[in-house]
Amino acid sequence: MALWGGRFESGASSMFKQVNDSLPFDQVMASQDIQGSISWSRALQKAGVLTADEQAQLEGALSELKAQADAGELDFNASSEEDIHSFVEAALIEKLGDIGRKLHTGRSRNDQVATDFRLWVREHIASLRADVLGVIKSLLNAASRHQEAIIPGYTHLQRAQPIHFAHWCLAYVEMLKRDLSRLDDLKVRMNQCPLGSGALAGTTFPVDRHAIAEELGFDSPCLNSLDAVSDRDFVLELLFVASTSMMHLSRLAEDMIFYNSGEAGFLQLGDSVTSGSSLMPQKKNPDALELMRGKCGRVFGALQALLVTMKGLPLAYNKDMQEDKEGAIDTVNQWHICLCIASEVLDSLQLNEERCRVAAAQGFSNATELADYLVGKGVPFRTGHDIAGRVVLQAIDKGCAIEDLPLSDLQAISDKIEDDVYPVLQLEYGVNQRNILGGTSKETVTKALYQELENLDKQG
């Protein structure tokens, strides 16, 4: 049943229907569309457009449809309707006749779809928030399992300074906490109700938009009808939050792919999140992580696509905006999948703590400790930095670690170096000296870990 057509002499071509019809994807918003229609029917009754009996019949039929939608029992494949709005209205008319035809009084699909989409996004903010918290929990559990472990810290993918593995886990916790904050901010900004804005100019019927907004769980009605029907900032923000979070997951995946490699060998992944090779029997590939990294580009593409779509649109609604949904729906699905698989990967990993420790001590990662030691002896840091660099060069020439150089070799470079330098050059010393807020010492990391576990409990 077309929601338009009185001024047309022929129907839509099959090719036009292919490009125009959105039911194949906007069917996921069936429950939200029906929820909005129930509220609209109540508003129409209060405005004197519907009788109490008509509204009761509409709400009863809509409630039955919503129960079917929530149970996944609506048959969209057998329908030739254009979109979810016409699908629901056709079902009402089939059941109620002319009473069903009254529901759309004063309403446009423009304010209807804007309301549906906001309800859908708001619902998924809650579920995605839970998914992000799940990854945070898995990171904290991994940190707790390997609380004493020391791994190499990297800059430029070169060994730089030793850090606690838990410190690495907590770095990703910080990133994901920002993702949570962005989701919360998005909910605040997008939680306004467009319903009652009509096609673009509002409606002539005296509906109570504040009551509609409150009933649907919005903080307030949208204040400008033109903006209400043409705003897709909330979708762009959702895609940006998803893109940022997927970027964090991609970095996490990249780190773990490297740590899992034969060259590093710092950790092993569980069989449940890896795959083999059709040719090479020995292979155990980190496919879950690689796909998590690969799907990041897919999500970025959805954000870029909608930005380009929206950039040239005049006020108010344009059909271009129908292109907002497929990318957003796919993004939410992919983000959800990646968050869930990230949790599984983290829960499955086992750290090779001894190999990590050996690697953390290599690459002259204690050179900064030597420079800091010299500062303690009254040497300006820049001079100490130069001295430490020459010590590293000496160790390279002799094929040994800094701490294995005899004191005579060290003192030949600087007479400020004394026998008390050797404890300073030990692995644990350098790690635990960084006992400052945000640092990698055992004490600081333990406090941070317990604080984050406490925060997680408060999140529920």
UniProtKB/Swiss-Prot annotation:
PANTHER family linked to this entry: ARGININOSUCCINATE LYASE
Catalytic activity: 2-(N(omega)-L-arginino)succinate = fumarate + L-arginine
Designated gene of the protein: argH
Annotated Pfam families: ASL_C2, Lyase_1
Keywords: Amino-acid biosynthesis, Arginine biosynthesis, Cytoplasm, Lyase
Primary location recorded for the protein, binned into one broad class: cytoplasm
Record-linked InterPro entries: Arg_succ_lyase_C (IPR029419), Argininosuccinate_lyase (IPR009049), Fumarase/histidase_N (IPR024083), Fumarate_lyase_CS (IPR020557), Fumarate_lyase_fam (IPR000362), Fumarate_lyase_N (IPR022761), L-Aspartase-like (IPR008948)
One cellular-component annotation, GO: cytosol
EC main group: lyase
UniProt protein name: Argininosuccinate lyase
Entry similarity comment: Belongs to the lyase 1 family. Argininosuccinate lyase subfamily.
EC number: 4.3.2.1
Subcellular locations according to the entry: Cytoplasm
Keyword set includes Magnesium: no
Gene Ontology molecular function: any one: argininosuccinate lyase activity
HAMAP family: Arg_succ_lyase
